[in-house]
Structure formats: structure tokens, C-alpha cells
Amino acid sequence: AQSVVDLGCGMGSYVRHFSREGLRAIGLDGNPSTPQLSKGACGVLDLSVIAEVAEPCDWVLSLEVGEHLPKVYEAAFMENLNRFNTQGMVLSWALEGQGGTGHVNEQSNDYIKAKICALGYVNDANAEASLRQAAQFAYFKRTIMVFRRTAWQDGMTQG
């Protein structure tokens, strides 16, 4: 991968890390204070509204974001995950009953996997297992999921 977008980037920690590693990294978050919180590294995007994406990245990263959006916005959020990548996504979504500040749409891994795979992805179980094993936070050991595109759409080319 040469580029990644972090949807729901918070303070931009992953964006700064990926940039230091030589990737083109973009961070977007629904919080209007994101530019200040990220020291100018990231921008603002309402992830509950389907975005027009001029230049998608190779991969999307979105960790513990979907559960903060009411279910009515779930499909739009997932479409944004889809539109912002050309190769795949690394996603985590709080599990039902996990609990957490602002969690309004916790879902099972199976539910999320079915929804994302219906958009034209396959679950990369090997990459997922590697990331879960390496995860520092206990909840990531249960919630990290990896998806790869199965088909290229509208002139997208494999990078």
C-alpha cells in the first residue's frame, strides 16, 4: 500500500505514524475540532453523509468509529468506507455489550462482516488474525477485521 485514509481519525495518531513510515496518509473525523486536536494533520468530514471522493486511497483504516453513529447512518458510513479505498479496509467496531462512551450502535463481528462483504469484499482471515494477535488494546483483539476488495469498480486499477 502507498496510501491510507483514517476515517474517524480522532487526534490523528495513526495518520502521523503512517506519514512517518512514508505513506500518503489522510485523516478525517466528524468532530469539528479535529484540525486543532490533530495539530493540523487531519480534516473534518461528516461520516454519516455519503461523501464524494475525488481520489480514494489504497486502504481505509477505521477503528472504533461505527458504533458512535446511530444505526440510521450505518449504511452511509459503510458506503464511505467503500468509496475511500481501492484495495481494502482495516475496521474495528465495538461488539454488542462492549460498552463505551457514546456507543449507540454496537454490532457483532458477523453482522459487520456480512454488511461489508455484501459491498464486494472478502474477509482476510490471515491478516485479521495477525493484527488481532499484535493488538495492544484488549478490545482490538476481538474487533479488528480486515477486508480486501474482490472487484474493481468504475475504472479503478489495482495499485
Where are these regions (language model features)?
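Conserved S-adenosyl-L-methionine
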Residues: 121-132
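Phosphate/oxyanion-binding loops and surfaces in catalytic or ligand/nucleic-acid-binding neighborhoods
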Residues: 84, 118-122, 147-153
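C-terminal alpha-helical "lid/dimerization" subdomain adjacent to the S-adenosyl-L-methionine
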Residues: 94-102, 124
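Flexible, glycine-/basic-rich loop-and-beta segments that form/coincide
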Residues: 141-159
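Short alpha-helix
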Residues: 105-120
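Conserved SAM-binding loop
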Residues: 2-97, 110-113, 148-149
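A generic fold-level signal
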Residues: 37, 139-140
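Short proline/glycine-enriched turn/loop segments at secondary-structure junctions
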Residues: 133-137
